[in-house]
Amino acid sequence: WSEYDQEKPLTLTGKVVESGYEHPHGHIRLETPAKTWLVVLAPPSRMQNRGLPREEIKVGSTVTVVAYANRAKPEEARAERITAAGKTVELR
């Protein structure tokens, strides 16, 4: 995970325009006012065990993530936590 800048956490809120709940890591494409991000999530089993089922990050949902930007890919970030459907889930 060293490719992500953990010194500068980002808080991103937007609409989910793509959602993947597959191994090894889930992902969402998050449309924010500034740009659209590819947000790397946790493995699906971890998300499910921590109370974040697939249905809560479906396309059209509004979510907030605290994430770290990828140093080499400016459109990508790794989520530390996500708030969806009124609850916050730690992903790491």
Predicted stretch roles:
Residues 70-92:
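OB-fold/S1-family single-stranded nucleic acid-binding modules
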Residues 22-31:
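Short aromatic-glycine-enriched beta-strand elements
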Residues 49-65:
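Short nucleic-acid-contacting surface segments enriched for D/E, G, S/T with interspersed K/R
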Residues 14-16:
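Conserved hydrophobic positions within beta-strands
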Residues 10-12, 63:
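Hydrophobic core residues within well-ordered beta-strands of beta-rich domains
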Residues 35-44:
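A short macromolecule-binding patch
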Residues 1-10:
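Short boundary/loop segments of OB/S1/cold-shock single-stranded nucleic-acid-binding domains
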